[in-house]
Design a protein with these regions (language model features):
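Helix N-cap/coil-helix junction residues
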Residues: 271-273, 326, 489
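Generic solvent-exposed, charged/amphipathic alpha-helical segments
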Residues: 257, 314-325, 363-366, 480-481
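Residue-level recognition of short, structured coil/turn motifs
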Residues: 266, 325-329, 370, 487
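Assembly/oligomerization scaffold segments
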Residues: 1-308, 367-368, 462-470
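Second-shell loop/turn segments in exported
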Residues: 304-310, 347-352
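Glycine-rich, acidic and aromatic/proline-enriched surface loops and short helix-turn segments
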Residues: 297, 312-339
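An acidic/polar, Gly/Ser/Thr-rich interaction patch typically located in mid-to-C-terminal regions
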Residues: 103-104, 114-119, 125-129, 133-148, ...
Length: 517
C-alpha cells in the first residue's frame, strides 16, 4: 500500500472529497536511444559527469556553494561542496564572461555506434536544475556521419527545461553548443539531455481513465497491471494522416509514469500510481478520441528463456530477469527483486525440453517458492513471500456503493501436487469436498511438493472470496491486506484484483479478494 499522510486518510472519511488529480507523464522516444548513447563534452570540471546526462535515470542535483559570483549564499539553501556532488551532470571548468557569453562554446557530443532509424520528435534539455539556471543561447545539430540532417538554434530561452521540437531520424551524432548563460561569471551546467520529448497529461486532458491491477496469492496466474485512457483527438493531433501530428512517434514500450494527488489543506499531496509501457493504441482518422493501453514490465518477458535449467530458484529467477533486459529504475538500479529465501530451494528441469518463456519461468519460480509475483507502484518487479500483515485501510459501509458479494467455494478435501516422474504428494484437508491438483515442472522432490501443498491449502481452505464497488482511494494495491465491512461481519481480505476508473471526478473502484481471516 502506498503511504500517505494522516490528513489524506481523514479526507476519505468526509462526505465530499476535495479535488483529486492524475498526472500522467509520457516519454516520446525510442527507449533504446538512452542505452546506446555515448556522451562526451568539452571543458569539463574535475567532478563533471557528462557521460551520465543521457542515461534517462532520475536526477536530483544538489545546490552547492562555489566561488562563482553570488554562488555561495548564506541562506541555508547551499550544501558544502565536496569532490563528488550528487548528480553533477555536465559542469564546465570555464565561466561565462561579464556579458554572460562563453569565449569558447561548451559543447556536448552524443554519439551512437549504429545509425538510429527510429523517429523521435526532438530533444529535452534540463539545464542547471539544482541552482535554477539555464542557457539563453544554444544550438543543436544532428548528423548522419558528416552530413548535417537537422539543426535548431535558440537565442532567447528563459527556462530551466528546453524542448527542441524537430523530427530526428537516421542519425548517429548530436552536437549541442552553448553560447550564452543566464548570468555572468557562471559555469555552464546541464543536468540531463533527454533524447525525445516529455509530455504530461492531467485530468483535464483525459477523456477517460482506468487503472487495473491483479495478482494471485499462489502465483498460479500471471500478475497484470495496466492503464487505459483516452485523449482528445478533435484537432487531429493523433490522426495518423496528419503530417504534423504526433501519431508517427508512437512506439511500443514508451514509458508512462502515473501519479495520483489530492488537495490536502490547500496543498496537493501526490502518490505513486505506477510505471507502465505503451502496448496498444488506436488513433482513428475519423475519431475524436485517441485511446491508449500501457502495461507493466511483464510485457518485456515474452522471449524464450535461455538461462540455466538447474540451480537455486533465486539464481534461475535472476538469470531470467537479466535476460529480459528490463529498463533500469530511475536511480539506475535493477528493476527486480528476488527474495533471498529462494536461494535455499533448488530445481532441475534440464530433461524438460519445453520452450518456456521468461515470464513462464518466473511464475513457476514464484509458485514453487510459495511467493507472490507482481510489479509494485514504484515499477519494481518482485518475487517474495506475501506480506500478510493487515493494513489500516477499511472498506466500510460508508465507502461502499453496494453491500459486498461473498462467494463460497466447495470444501477442500485435499491438495494433490505432482512431482518428479509421475509421483504425487497428497495433503488431506477436510473429510469431504474437492481435490485441488497442482502441477509445476520445477517441483522435483517430495519435500518441495509438500511445501507447495501446505501453502495451497492455507490459501484455499478459507473458501470465501469477496467483491464489491466502492469510493476508491488510489493508495490501495493488489495483494494489500485490508478490512472489508459486510452486513454482518468484518472481514480480513487479501486483495487479488482492483480497478480504478474516473471520468473527471473522484475515483470509483471495484475490488475482489480472498477472505483470509
Amino acid at each position: 500500500m502506498v503511504p500517505v499522510s494522516n490528513e489524506w486518510k481523514a479526507q476519505h472519511d468526509e462526505l465530499l472529497l476535495p479535488e483529486t488529480f492524475i498526472e500522467l507523464s509520457y516519454e516520446i522516444t525510442d527507449p533504446q536511444l538512452a542505452v546506446d548513447a555515448n556522451t562526451s563534452a568539452t571543458n569539463e570540471e574535475s567532478f563533471s559527469e557528462a557521460e551520465n546526462i543521457t542515461d534517462a535515470t532520475e536526477k536530483n542535483p544538489e545546490r552547492y556553494g562555489t566561488l562563482e559570483q553570488n554562488e555561495w549564499g548564506l541562506d541555508g539553501t547551499f550544501n558544502y561542496f565536496d569532490e563528488t556532488p550528487e548528480d553533477a551532470g555536465y559542469t564546465t571548468s570555464v565561466l561565462s564572461g561579464a556579458d554572460a557569453k562563453y569565449t569558447a562554446a561548451p559543447t556536448i557530443t552524443i554519439s551512437f555506434a549504429e545509425l538510429q532509424t527510429a523517429l523521435i520528435p526532438g530533444l529535452t534539455i534540463t539545464w542547471g536544475e539544482g541552482i535554477g539556471e539555464w542557457a539563453v543561447s544554444f544550438r543543436a545539430t544532428v548528423y548522419n556521419g558528416t552530413t548535417k540532417i537537422a539543426q535548431m538554434s535558440v537565442a532567447d530561452n528563459e527556462s530551466v527545461v528546453s524542448k527542441m521540437s524537430m523530427d530526428l531520424q537516421n542519425f548517429n551524432k548530436i552536437v549541442i553548443e552553448i553560447f550564452e548563460w543566464c548570468l555572468p561569471h557562471r559555469r555552464c551546467r546541464v543536468t540531463e539531455v533527454f533524447l525525445g520529448i516529455r509530455e504530461t497529461y492531467t485530468k483535464a486532458e483525459l477523456l477517460g481513465y482506468t487503472h487495473s491491477e491483479s495478482a494471485d496469492l499462489l502465483s498460479a496466474t500471471l500478475p497484470k497491471s495496466e492503464i487505459t485512457f483516452g485523449l482528445d483527438n478533435s484537432t487531429g493531433r493523433w490522426n495518423p494522416n496528419n503530417p504534423s501530428g504526433v501519431e508517427k512517434y508512437l512506439l511500443e514500450r514508451q514509458k508512462f509514469v502515473v501519479k495520483y494527488g489530492m488537495n490536502v489543506n490547500g496543498m496537493v499531496e501526490k502518490i505513486k500510481g505506477g510505471t507502465f509501457w505503451l502496448s496498444e493504441w488506436n488513433t482513428p482518422a475519423n475519431g475524436i478520441e485517441a485511446s491508449f493501453t500501457a502495461r507493466d514490465a511483464v510485457t518485456f518477458m515474452n522471449d524464450v528463456y535461455t538461462g540455466p535449467r538447474s540451480g537455486t530458484l533465486k539464481a534461475i529467477a535472476t538469470a531470467a530477469f537479466k535476460q529480459a533486459n528490463l529498463p533500469v529504475m530511475s536511480d539506475g538500479s535493477a528493476r527486480y527483486i528476488v527474495d533471498d529465501s529462494l536461494a535455499d530451494i533448488t530445481t532441475d528441469f534440464t530433461e524438460d525440453t519445453t520452450a518456456y518463456t521468461i515470464v513462464d519461468v518466473l511464475q513457476m519460480v514464484a509458485h514453487m517458492g510459495c511467493c507472490v509475483f507482481y510489479q509494485d507502484r514504484g515499477g519494481m518487479v518482485r518475487i517474495e513471500p506475501h506480506n500478510e500483515e493487515i493494513t489500516d485501510y477499511v472498506i466500510n459501509r460508508f465507502r461502499s456503493y453496494t453491500h459486498p458479494e461473498i462467494t463460497i467455494s466447495k470444501p477442500l478435501r485435499a491438495v494433490s501436487v505432482s512431482y518428479g516422474e509421475n509421483l504425487t504428494e497428497t495433503l488431506p484437508v477436510e473429510a469431504q469436498g474437492e481435490v485441488q491438483t497442482v502441477s509445476n515442472e520445477f517441483i522435483n522432490t517430495a519435500a518441495d511438493a509438500k511445501r507447495v501443498a501446505n501453502r495451497t491449502a492455507d490459501v484455499l481452505k478459507g473458501r470465501k472470496t469477496i467483491s464489491g464497488e466502492f469510493r476508491a482511494d488510489p493508495r490501495l494495491s493488489a495483494l494489500d491486506v485490508i478490512s472489508v465491512e459486510s452486513k454482518y461481519a468484518d472481514n480480513k481480505v487479501a486483495i487479488t484484483e482492483i480497478t480504478y476508473t474516473t471520468s473527471g471526478g473522484a475515483f470509483k473502484g471495484t475490488y475482489s479478494g480472498r477472505i483470509v481471516g
